[in-house]
Amino acid sequence: MYAPGPFSAMTSFAADVPTMLAMVIASSLLLSAALTVVVGGRQHDGLALWALVLLLNAVAHALLALRGLVPDVLSIVVANTLLSCVFAGLIQAVLQFQGRPARWALVLAPAVPILFLVMVFLDDFQARLIAVSVVLGVQAYWALWAVLARRRVTVGRGQWLLMAGLGLEALVLLVRASLAASLPTTQIGLLQGDTLQTLTFMTTFCVVLL
């Protein structure tokens, strides 16, 4: 998801990556600010945490956009670890909204293998792409399951839009990992797009909006 796209043959649906990054960053910042204003003093309905998650998402994508301009430890290691924390925060926000107990140690656990694997495979693009895509894909499905588990008692149709976005993002991530593992890889830069890279950032943008 958040590493250079290796599928250069899949160019029929490739958008401009810097534009998509800017889109995700701007939307995350604006929605985070809006939620912060709306939340006010409320701290227990998940919205305050959701605002923080959106801010972290903006920071993570800003670091990705700075690939080649800042040290790799920031644009690769920190960025991908923050993205794992974004999914963790999303899961916890859903649990908090549903009135379920906090499970921070559990939901943050995937950030540990992300940090370890990205550092180990810092110079191995293909392995890093597979590892990050699999872990983030599993986290996306986890967030989807958290919403699904209480769908019958949650009021509103917004949950279905969120589930659709999370399901699509998880699918794109896991398909990308599968293709990276099975196809020859030619390393290109993060700012060069391919079809799956485009779909990944588009689904990220959709989840932010939902």
Regions inferred by a protein language model and the residue ranges of each:
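Short aromatic-rich membrane-water interface segments that cap or initiate transmembrane helices
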Residues: M10-P18, G193-T204
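Signal-transducing coiled-coil linker helices
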Residues: T204-L210
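Hydrophobic transmembrane alpha-helical segments in integral membrane proteins
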Residues: Y2-L29
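Juxtamembrane segments at transmembrane-helix boundaries
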Residues: L30-L47, H61-T198, F205
